[in-house]
Amino acid sequence: MNCIIKTESEIKKMKVSGKIAAEVLEMIENYIKPNISTEEINNICHNFIIKKKAVSACLGYHGFPKSICISVNDVVCHGIPNKNQILKSGDIVNIDVTIIKKNYHADTSKMFLVGQTNILSQRLCKIAQESLYKSLNILKPGIPLYKIGEVIQNYVENNNFSVVKEYCGHGIGRAFHEEPYVLHYKNKSHVILEKGMIFTIEPMINAGSHEVKCMKDGWTVKTKDHSLSAQYEHTVLITENGCDILTWQKNEKIPSKFINK
């Protein structure tokens, strides 16, 4: 596997891209309420990205028709914003943003709870986010890549949820998708983490079975059993002693139990 080690100049540019991607999610939070359409959310994000003098990486990517992915309830990933899809109280929503600034990509996503949600929805989103945080906690040079999937799967299954296996994290830089490919379940990858690697970790967690199906539009992926699904994603840089989260949000805080002392 040919993993690209980023130069200091490239890392500097990707930090700028990561900051913008994070700002999109920070900005859109106040708009996630009942009675807004997913297309309106898309348009608000698109305009914000343009104001930042960046470009949506999703728009036109292999024919994808919108600027961001919005996945609601049993949609696992790649949901297409639609003027007829109106959010309602009780929905859980993933917004996935990938931007390009000065030729360098950054990719991030998070869950939003709409109005009054039930305990299952809240717990699913919590465990999905915590599984990402647990994986971030182990990152440093010399760690085998497969450890990421091992940590995520163990945590998720110990909490009685399942990990989607068809989609994975990925290297990122000048290209949207680069090596290495980051599996979120137990695997036998021989890749060893090195300083200067940049990739995404983006576990997709289902309340029921891990099985998924792709819809006729060729993009939208749903759980086969119609159970809820949740995902969180960050773009991370491997540093000399750990990692730097390039898409960190200002209001984000990792619980102390997930931080090495």
From Swiss-Prot:
The keyword Protease applies. GO terms for molecular function: initiator methionyl aminopeptidase activity; metal ion binding; metalloaminopeptidase activity. SUPFAM superfamilies: Creatinase/aminopeptidase. Keywords: Aminopeptidase, Hydrolase, Metal-binding, Protease. It catalyses: Release of N-terminal amino acids, preferentially methionine, from peptides and arylamides. InterPro entries: Creatinase/aminopeptidase-like, Pept_M24, Pept_M24_MAP, Pept_M24A_MAP1. The keyword Protein transport does not apply. A divalent metal cation 1 binds at D96, D107, E233. Substrate binds at H78, H177. Gene3D superfamilies: Creatinase/methionine aminopeptidase superfamily. One of its GO terms (cellular component) is cytosol. Its cofactor is Co(2+); Zn(2+); Mn(2+); Fe(2+). Binds 2 divalent metal cations per subunit. Has a high-affinity and a low affinity metal-binding site. The true nature of the physiological cofactor is under debate. The enzyme is active with cobalt, zinc, manganese or divalent iron ions. Most likely, methionine aminopeptidases function as mononuclear Fe(2+)-metalloproteases under physiological conditions, and the catalytically relevant metal-binding site has been assigned to the histidine-containing high-affinity site. GO terms for biological process: proteolysis. Its EC number is 3.4.11.18. A divalent metal cation 2 binds at D107, H170, E202, E233. Monomer. Removes the N-terminal methionine from nascent proteins. The N-terminal methionine is often cleaved when the second residue in the primary sequence is small and uncharged (Met-Ala-, Cys, Gly, Pro, Ser, Thr, or Val). Requires deformylation of the N(alpha)-formylated initiator methionine before it can be hydrolyzed. NCBIfam families: met_pdase_I. Belongs to the peptidase M24A family. Methionine aminopeptidase type 1 subfamily. This is Methionine aminopeptidase. The gene is map.
